[in-house]
Amino acid sequence: MEEMKFLIMNNPWVLFATSATLLISIFLFFRRKSPNMAWPEGPKTLPIIGNMHLLGGTALQVVLYNLAKVHGRVMTIWIGSWRPVIVVSDIEQAWEVLVNKSSDYSARDMPDITKIVTADWRTISTSDSGPHWSNLRKGLQNIAISPNNLAAQFQFQEKDIIKMIQILEQEAKDNNGIVKPLDHLKKATIRLISRLVFGRDFEEDKYVEDMHHAIEELIRISGYARLAEAFYYAKYLPSHRKAVRYVEELKQIVKNLIRPFLSVNPPTNTYLHFLRSQNYDEEVVIFAIFETYLLGVDSTSSTTAWALAYLVREPSVQDRLHQELDHFAKQNDRKILKVEDMNKLQYLQAVIKETMRMKPIAPLAIPHKACKDTSLMGNKINKGTRVMVNLYALHHNKNVFNDPFKFMPERFLKVDNQDAKGKAMEQSLLPFSAGMRICAGMELGKLQFSFALANLIFAFKWSCVDDGVLPDMSDELGFVLLMKTPLKARINPRN
């Protein structure tokens, strides 16, 4: 500290830079509010850091949920001294933003560092709504993950799950019955996405392993993006510059990984065929493909791991689910459950919904931005204003979900979508968001999640590694909601 003080006081350039930074931050702090827009009330701010002092200590979505109890269902949060965001924590206002005025709030506002691996924000999740975004989305939904194309994948998904079960059996034999399922779930999802993108089966593990590594590395350094988003001048820090260089290296790794497939003629029902037919430049093609992995792999596999963790903690729920699966399999002469069976299994679907309610994979979604002057609750909202919907808050509203912090799939078996309570539950459960920016891969994600979970519970009884030591349910928010401590469990074959 003394050395730093000496450096500042005796070097006029350092003194000037430090003073200028402080003065600019204070200037921004006092000039920040738009004179013709009344921002919703929120917690008191501090110069330079805004509300950052309130946002630590626990998961951000939980902090915002608790702040909303004090400051209202619509409040302003200052992330640093220059980035205000309106946080919505109530279903009525959430639907106003996401659905009723979906086109008004359909723009994006992303950290600068993300431009590197999104072709300058020209992918589905990062681009503003418009012809480019619409065309990309239609190509993915109407071709690559169309109902017919997904149905064609069922036989390959069955092979993948049989392979995963065999690997888990061997892992359990080698480790006194203990397994770590997450990486196996991720690799199965990578294989599925690869078939939809390229139209070929990836039996060899090299590409799968390399893609898995690229995704993990990008998630690992995602914290730097949040730092730069909070503090404008953080992008000039050595640590951020180092992160940018590392993301540039990852960009090259991803390009080298995907580029060899671009010269091959893919089947017409693949995402690659669609992208090439649109004459997009190579960067858009590569990173539109990479986005399907980045947003699809961890979301599906992590949600499945969350479900397994809950079922380890709640043996009675696991037993009831297995009874349903076992009964259905015997009635339909199944050795494994098939993808087309998933929507016929009511309790399975209740477990799926309850897992996504408790641990929404993107609890704060991707922040929206007003693409024109609009309104919220009758109040003017200027073009460019950022709005974040706290899906976690919607999912834990005690007026909608009884005992909201308890894992209770039965709540979804009693729902009548025609009465007020049922409609409120249906409207409040938004794990994939809603409106025109709803997750493009929603149906694929739900199918893969249901299929993997059903067969893993059908094949094995899952229990604690040690008696009385329950799985850690602590989470951390990266691109998706991850388990802070990846699941380890003891498995016993059922058949």
UniProtKB/Swiss-Prot annotation:
One of its GO terms (cellular component) is endoplasmic reticulum membrane. Induction: Up-regulated by methyl jasmonate treatment. SUPFAM superfamilies: Cytochrome P450 (SSF48264). GO terms for biological process: isoquinoline alkaloid biosynthetic process. GO terms for molecular function: (S)-canadine synthase activity; (S)-nandinine synthase activity; (S)-stylopine synthase activity; heme binding; iron ion binding; monooxygenase activity. InterPro entries: Cyt_P450, Cyt_P450_CS, Cyt_P450_E_grp-I, Cyt_P450_sf. Pathway: Alkaloid biosynthesis. Coiled coil: none annotated. Expressed in roots and at lower levels in stems and leaves. The keyword Metal-binding applies. Its cofactor is heme. Its EC number is 1.14.19.64, 1.14.19.68, 1.14.19.73. It is a single-pass membrane protein. It is found in: Endoplasmic reticulum membrane. It catalyses: (S)-cheilanthifoline + reduced [NADPH--hemoprotein reductase] + O2 = (S)-stylopine + oxidized [NADPH--hemoprotein reductase] + 2 H2O + H(+); (S)-tetrahydrocolumbamine + reduced [NADPH--hemoprotein reductase] + O2 = (S)-canadine + oxidized [NADPH--hemoprotein reductase] + 2 H2O + H(+); (S)-scoulerine + reduced [NADPH--hemoprotein reductase] + O2 = (S)-nandinine + oxidized [NADPH--hemoprotein reductase] + 2 H2O + H(+). The keyword NAD does not apply. The chain crosses the membrane at residues 10-30. Keywords: Endoplasmic reticulum, Heme, Iron, Membrane, Metal-binding, Monooxygenase, Oxidoreductase, Transmembrane, Transmembrane helix. Heme binds at residue 439. Belongs to the cytochrome P450 family. Methylenedioxy bridge-forming cytochrome P450 involved in the biosynthesis of isoquinoline alkaloids. Converts (S)-cheilanthifoline to (S)-stylopine, (S)-scoulerine to (S)-nandinine and (S)-tetrahydrocolumbamine to (S)-canadine, but only the ring A (2,3-position) of the substrates is converted. Catalyzes an oxidative reaction that does not incorporate oxygen into the product. This is Trifunctional (S)-stylopine synthase 2/(S)-nandinine synthase/(S)-canadine synthase. It comes from Eschscholzia californica (California poppy). The lineage of its organism: Eukaryota, Viridiplantae, Streptophyta, Embryophyta, Tracheophyta. The gene is CYP719A3.
